[in-house]
UniProtKB/Swiss-Prot annotation:
One of its GO terms (cellular component) is nucleus. PROSITE patterns: G_DYNAMIN_1, G_DYNAMIN_2, GED. GO terms for biological process: innate immune response; response to virus. Signal peptide: none annotated. GO terms for molecular function: GTP binding; GTPase activity. This is Protein Mx1. InterPro entries: Dynamin (IPR022812), Dynamin_GTPase (IPR001401), Dynamin_GTPase_CS (IPR019762), Dynamin_N (IPR045063), Dynamin_stalk (IPR000375), G_DYNAMIN_dom (IPR030381), GED (IPR003130), GED_dom (IPR020850). Belongs to the TRAFAC class dynamin-like GTPase superfamily. Dynamin/Fzo/YdjA family. Pfam families: Dynamin_M (PF01031), Dynamin_N (PF00350), GED (PF02212). It comes from the Eukaryota.
Length: 397
């Protein structure tokens, strides 16, 4: 635990000033002249971007049908010490709105979007900045971009899809940008427009992170919302499974980090990596000798010390290169395994066990009073219309 706390302190001391500097430069508009490092959050319309950002920030962002994010939203999260009070601020153009409670965020952002893009369904490339300072958020800055839509609806401009894609592309095509692509788990990932755009500007996937947003609770609410008892019980079970799966995945990831502390000196892969590094180092030394022969001759007077230091450096490089490669492969695989496979299987098994309890089936399927009344009304209407049809049929005869 002490090592984790030391790492966090080191991060806050070294990384936080860099994030603050980038945020300051972006606020000054330097991004028009220079590409600044950024994490851009993209996704198809209603892909679950808001849920991801709300989980990180702890505040409610604008939601609804259609295009909700109509301006790029720079979400600046700053971690405070335990006991310090939550603070927030929304900035756009020359306007700054101080916030004292998380519940004020949604309305403030909506006002900012209406001010910049107008009241309606248009979009703008002007930034809205949301600063959130809290003990419960990470030190992080994200840029939330409008959700991708294919077809204009209602009063939307006919070329709204093209406008959004053009806006997104201005961010994700920069080499300094990491693209966080949010994909709902209940669709074919290969067909998502956001992922296609990310692959187009980053074919190797070096700057792209895919985040699969589970939709179990959403599907439950949409399809079984009338059965309140079933919904409440199922949501409780889903939350319990999610927490257990998170704990199991975390333990497995920690185990992989512990395993990487072991140096496999006899491992063929490690030996190959070490060989490659040695060849590169030798090539560098040859180049240095050609450029500056005098320096090379002076260094050769201390062969033993130089060789020992060089060997240690080469082993360290080989070890960390293999660690990075192994962790880069295994950690995403573990996360995908738990999200896409075991989580769904556990929910399916739990729901089947739930419905096998015959003593509670009638309680689970008990409808809300307004649903029962609606059904009675529809039945009476159906009877009236059926009688009217029969009378009309007799009249025509």
């Amino acid at each position: 635990m002490d090592s984790v706390n030391n790492l966090c302190r080191h991060y806050e001391e070294k990384v936080r000033p860099c994030i603050d500097l980038i945020d300051t430069l972006r606020a000054l508009g330097v991004e028009q002249d220079l590409a600044l490092p950024a994490i851009a959050v993209i996704g198809d319309q209603s892909s679950g971007k808001s849920s991801v950002l709300e989980a990180l920030s702890g505040v409610a962002l604008p939601r609804g049908s259609g295009i909700v994010t109509r301006c790029p939203l720079v979400l600046k999260l700053r971690k405070l010490k335990e006991g310090e009070e939550w603070r927030g601020k929304v900035s756009y153009d020359d306007i700054e709105v101080e916030l004292s409670d998380p519940s004020e965020v949604e309305e403030a952002i909506n006002k900012g979007q209406n001010f910049i893009a107008g009241v309606g369904l248009g979009i703008s490339d002007k930034l809205i900045s949301l600063d959130v300072s809290s003990p419960n958020v990470p030190d992080l800055t994200l840029i939330d971009l409008p959700g991708i839509t294919r077809v204009a609806v209602g009063n939307q401009p006919a070329d709204i899809g093209r406008q959004i894609k053009r806006l997104i592309k201005t961010y994700i095509q920069k080499q300094e940008t990491i693209n966080l692509v949010v994909v709902p788990s209940n669709v074919d990932i290969a067909t998502t427009e956001a992922l296609s755009m990310a692959q187009e500007v980053d074919p190797e996937g070096d700057r792209t992170i895919e985040m699969v947003q589970t939709a179990f609770v959403k599907i439950l609410s949409n399809d079984f919302g009338d059965f309140l008892n079933l919904c409440c019980t199922a949501k409780s079970k889903i939350k319990e499974i999610r927490l257990n799966q998170e704990k199991e995945a975390e333990n497995l990831i920690r185990l992989h980090f512990q395993m990487e502390q072991i140096v496999y000196c006899q491992d063929q892969v490690y030996k190959e990596t070490l060989k490659t590094i040695r060849e590169k180092e030798a090539e560098k030394e040859k180049t240095k000798a050609l450029i500056n022969p005098a320096t090379f001759q002076n260094n050769s007077q201390f062969p033993q010390k130089g060789l020992t230091t060089t060997e240690m450096t080469q082993h360290l490089k080989a070890y960390y290169q293999e660690c990075r490669r192994n962790i880069g492969r295994q950690i995403p695989l573990i996360i995908q395994y738990f999200i896409l496979k075991t989580f769904g299987e556990e929910i399916e098994k739990t729901m089947l066990q739930l419905l096998q309890d015959t003593s509670k089936c009638s309680w689970f399927l008990e409808e809300q009073s307004d649903t029962r009344e609606k059904k009675k009304f529809l039945k009476r209407r159906l009877l009236r219309l059926d009688e009217a049809r029969q009378k009309l049929a007799k009249f025509s005869d």
